[in-house]
Design a protein with these regions (language model features):
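Rossmann-like dinucleotide-binding cores of NAD(P)H-dependent redox enzymes
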Residues: 1, 6-10, 57, 82-129, ...
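Feature captures the FAD/FMN-dependent oxidoreductase FAD-binding
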Residues: 1-40, 129-140, 147-148, 169-173, ...
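General small-molecule cofactor/ligand-binding pocket signal
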Residues: 5-7, 48, 120-122, 140, ...
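Cofactor-binding loop segments of dinucleotide-utilizing enzymes, especially the Rossmann-like FAD-
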Residues: 30, 74, 97-100, 217
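FAD-site-proximal beta/loop scaffold in flavoenzymes
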Residues: 43-66, 149-222
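Rossmann-like NAD(P)H-binding beta-loop-alpha module
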Residues: 61-91
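A conserved FAD-binding loop/helix module that cradles the flavin
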Residues: 81, 215-243
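Mid-to-C-terminal Rossmann-like scaffold of FAD/NAD(P)H-dependent oxidoreductases
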Residues: 116-118, 126-137, 145, 241-279
Length: 279
């Protein structure tokens, strides 16, 4: 109804090529590529990426999940995977993450509901290796005393001595983050976590190529839906200015109505008990 034309099944390898036909381009591609940690056993059969698992769940396709599942990660997506596995019939489900319990990034409600469903939580764990020959048989862990990040944003982990332990599993799901599905061949400068670099995440959504802007998870990683909407609106306002407008994209979805402060007379109001005065 608004004149938007949707082109489906189109692959755009170089966004700059779109500038031949369009005055401005917005990259709102999200973060739909799962992260596979470069650790021993990560390529074994039975190791699944979060986005693939949840996509297959949503489409009713086979997930490749077994009966004993370990989810590596402590955010909301990790618990989405764990609780989905529960509903798909997994008999034993573990969620393990690097953060201590009080610092886990998942919503507290998600964590509590998972525990109520019988999902086992293992905070402050480092993933040493995924075991198996051909197919996953489990994961070796060690307890984490503390961890920090170096100047390259790599985790520096302080392990507890003699704390190595093993949890058996036939399925391991990586849920340690997502990234935009884009490469340097696209011709845009990229930032941390394969994000699209913009001049300023908060105030300037322009990319390294003139006329191309970016917004949402593609520039700052996986956040909430409302943050993506806000980022998209900010980008739309900036694009409007780029095209010669004033950047005002506000709209009134319904006419404003000023309520009438007068609600009438209630006989004997002054003699009523306070609890009966509420309307």
């Amino acid at each position: 109804d608004q004149g938007v034309k949707i082109e489906r099944n189109e692959k755009v390898e170089k966004p700059a090529d779109l500038r031949k036909d369009y005055d401005a381009v917005l990259m709102a591609i999200g973060g739909h590529k799962g992260v596979r940690l470069p650790m021993e056993g990560s390529s074994l059969e039975g190791v699944i990426l979060n986005v693939d698992f949840l996509k297959n769940c949503g489409m009713g396709k086979a997930t490749g999940m077994g009966k004993k599942v370990i989810v590596l990660g402590g955010g909301n997506v990790a618990f989405d995977c764990a609780r989905s596995a529960k509903r798909l019939g997994a008999e034993e489900i573990h969620v393990a993450c690097l953060e201590a319990r009080e610092h886990m990034t998942a919503d507290e409600e998600e964590i509590q509901q998972a525990v109520e469903e019988g999902i086992m939580i293992h905070p402050a764990q480092t993933f040493e290796r995924i075991t198996g020959t051909g197919h996953v048989t489990g994961v070796d862990f060690m307890n984490v005393k503390s961890f920090t990040f170096d100047e390259n944003h790599r985790a520096v982990i302080h392990r507890e001595e003699n704390s190595e332990h093993h949890i058996e599993a036939d399925t391991v799901i990586f849920a340690v983050g997502q990234r935009p599905d884009i490469t340097e061949e696209a011709g845009l400068a990229l930032g941390r976590g394969n994000s699209i670099a913009v001049r300023d995440i908060e105030t300037d959504k322009a990319t390294s190529v003139d006329g191309i802007f970016a917004a949402g998870d593609a520039i700052y990683g996986t956040k909430s839906v409302i943050m993506a909407i806000e980022s998209g609106r900010e980008a739309a306002a900036q694009i409007d200015q780029y095209l010669g407008g004033n950047g005002d994209i506000s709209e009134k979805l319904a006419p404003e109505q000023k309520p009438d402060a007068y609600i009438g007379i209630c006989e004997g109001f002054g003699y009523m008990q306070r609890k009966n005065r509420c309307i």
